Regions:
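Short helix-capping/linker turns of helical repeat alpha-solenoids
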Residues: 1, 10-12, 17, 31-33, ...
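Hydrophobic face of amphipathic alpha-helices that form TPR/SEL1-like repeat modules
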Residues: 3-10, 28, 44-53, 84-93, ...
Length: 252
């Protein structure tokens, strides 16, 4: 029944029918069957997703939060780790912003193996968001996540090393990060959100362009710099605009 729900919701091997998918998920969540017990966390996560996206049901952030809390089950490693990480993201947004809650859920998810949350934790430690600033813990999380393929973490490592004038290290990581700009493929490979992957590649591309433009840590190459500036603008215009402003003000 769970598989049927997913297939109908996402249109896998059948016509997309989100309403029917939601119906199946609700049946699993409300079932007393022992066979359905291990699927309840996944069903609650997917139902939360449906309410958050307003797909198959009326949009409700509050109902999405309630269902994700059920799916996350107080950080239980056998529950939905995806829900734990998603709650971390949810509490970092303006509508329900609570950075302490965000840090808590990313910590739980990271402890249960979430690659996405490991990268976000690194950023939160680095800038003291929801927790006291701790550069050592930040680098531990960012390096660990980057080694496991977290592009967002790689982008922030590039920024960290560039700002501390370790230009060759920043450029080396940036070159590796920008080798693949197929965001959808990277999202499937790492199970990380495409939005954050795009931000990570855009950050790396902009700092690499800056290194090439000014000859910092690499040989000066204006044509290559232009290429990477364009990549950053294409992948995340907001990130590129923010970094361009910092560059114009002489901060980077």
């Amino acid at each position: 029944m769970y598989q049927l729900g997913v297939m109908h919701y996402d249109g896998l091997g059948t016509n997309e029918d989100p309403e029917k998918g939601v119906e199946y998920m609700k049946k699993i969540l409300n079932s007393d069957s022992s066979k359905a017990r291990h699927l309840k966390f996944a069903a609650a996560y997917n139902l939360g997703r449906a309410y958050y996206e307003g797909c198959g049901v009326k949009h409700s952030t509050e109902e999405a939060e309630r269902l994700w809390l059920i799916a996350a089950d107080h950080g239980n490693p056998k529950a939905s780790v995806k829900a734990q990480s998603t709650l971390g993201m949810l509490y970092s947004m303006s509508a329900l912003k609570d950075l302490r809650k965000s840090f808590f859920w990313h910590s739980e998810a990271c402890g249960n193996g979430s690659l996405e949350s490991q990268g976000v934790l690194g950023v939160m430690y680095l800038y003291g968001q929801g927790i006291r600033q701790n550069t050592k813990a930040a680098l531990e999380c960012l390096k660990g996540a980057a080694e496991r393929g977290n592009i967002y973490a790689q982008g922030h490592l590039v920024e960290y090393y560039y700002n501390r004038k370790f230009y060759s290290t920043a450029a080396t990581i940036a070159m590796r990060t920008t080798e693949n700009d197929d965001i959808d493929m990277l999202a499937k490979m790492t199970d990380c959100l495409p939005t954050y992957i795009a931000k990570g590649v855009a950050m790396a591309a902009f700092y690499l362009a800056r290194c090439l433009h000014l000859g910092r840590g690499v040989q000066q190459d204006q044509a290559a710099a232009k290429k990477y500036y364009s990549m950053a603008c294409l992948l995340d215009p907001d990130v590129a605009s923010d970094l361009e402003l910092k560059a114009n003000l002489g901060r980077i």
